[in-house]
A protein has these predicted regions:
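Conserved pre-motif I regulatory segment
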Residues: 1-21
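A substrate-engagement module of RecA-like helicase motors
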Residues: 44-153, 158-161
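Walker A/P-loop
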Residues: 14-34
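Generic beta-sheet signal
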Residues: 16-20, 46-48, 152-155, 180-182
């Protein structure tokens, strides 16, 4: 693990790419997250994107940040959940006429953001849903807004690589990915996903 941590840190310092292949249980998550967090703390990067194809991998990464926080780390992270999974309505129609959470959303969103910012460092799906229910705001939009105040964003590949879904607030301004670290979990899964993203169907 020590050797892996060193390689990851040097890769970040020299703005390079690193591919890691190691067996399950080798400690890849902590060995990549720790040097990335260190680099952000030293001002070598602004934000970490931890990208996964599966929810379980996101959960493991989430727990890794929690372990570091238990040992004194102050680092805000948000877990982004797909709109159709986190929406409170049976059918997600994002307009004020059909969704009570969309109606008046912008009147209440600042209070919701302020509460999370001042009371939490970990914005999990459960925390976001609870706060969204309390202030009656859209949980999906609340998660996206909390990402602006987070040092680490845990999300699906789509939010970075899919041209239709990518987070435009980060990737449509200036040089793409400037100041960001991308930790891509199980990168072999990205190939078939990328094919889907860039394939059209009639």
């Amino acid at each position: 693990q020590k050797e892996l941590v060193t390689h990851v840190y040097h890769t970040i310092c020299h703005s390079r790419k690193l591919f890691i292949e190691a067996p399950t249980g080798a400690g890849k998550t902590i060995s990549t997250v720790f040097p990335a967090v260190k680099a952000v703390g030293e001002g070598k990067a602004d934000r970490i994107f931890y990208l996964t194809a599966k929810t379980i991998a996101r959960t493991v990464a989430d727990r890794t940040f929690d372990l570091l926080r238990e040992r004194g780390l102050h680092f805000k992270t948000v877990v982004l959940t797909a709109r159709d999974k986190i929406c409170f309505m049976e059918e997600s129609e994002c307009n004020p006429d059909s969704c009570p959470y969309a109606k008046g959303h912008f009147d209440r969103i600042n209070d919701a953001i302020f509460e999370l910012m001042t009371t939490k460092e970990h914005y999990s799906r459960e925390e976001i849903e609870a706060c969204a229910q309390k202030y009656k705001v859209c949980p999906f939009e609340l998660g996206l807004d909390m990402s602006l105040f987070s040092d680490g964003i845990l999300c699906d590949y789509n939010y970075v690589f899919d041209p239709n879904v990518k987070l435009k607030r980060y990737f449509d301004q200036g040089e793409p990915g400037q100041g960001y670290l991308f930790l891509v979990d199980e990168a072999h899964n990205l190939v078939p996903r990328a094919r889907e993203m860039y394939s059209a169907s009639l």
